[in-house]
């Protein structure tokens, strides 16, 4: 079974929030490695923000269900985007029996979009 999440965000909106709140915004939403990778570039920050929201949707939690930093956007060795889950996001994925998460990101001058597919295993959850 598959679950999906998609999100689109206006890059100027992220720039406005970054201009207004600066490091406070970055520290609330992004991990240190995401902050380093994006280096303050609004298109990159917007794309990662969209991935986080799309992942929350694929997990069925919404933005109130997990912390922003429970979802970290990383790069595979191939350069493809992926996510690492922590905290409540990881627990939710385990409950759903997520065995794989695929991520696609794109952005233009004005918008960033992310599409996330979570593949669920058909195996019953093991009880300890």
Language-model features, listed with the residues they occupy:
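Core catalytic alpha/beta fold that binds nucleotide/phospho-ligands
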Residues: 1-128
């Amino acid at each position: 079974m598959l679950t999906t999440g998609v999100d689109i965000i206006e890059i100027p909106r992220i720039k406005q929030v970054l201009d207004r709140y600066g490091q406070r915004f970055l520290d609330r939403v992004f991990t240190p490695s995401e902050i380093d990778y994006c280096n303050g570039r609004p298109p990159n920050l917007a794309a990662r923000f969209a991935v986080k929201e799309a992942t929350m949707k694929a997990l069925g939690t919404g933005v109130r269900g997990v912390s922003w930093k429970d979802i970290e956007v990383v790069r595979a060795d191939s350069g493809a985007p992926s996510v690492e889950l922590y905290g409540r996001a990881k627990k939710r994925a385990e409950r759903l029996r997520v065995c794989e998460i695929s991520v696609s990101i794109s952005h233009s001058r004005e918008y960033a979009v992310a599409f996330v597919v979570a593949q669920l295993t058909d195996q019953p959850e093991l009880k300890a």
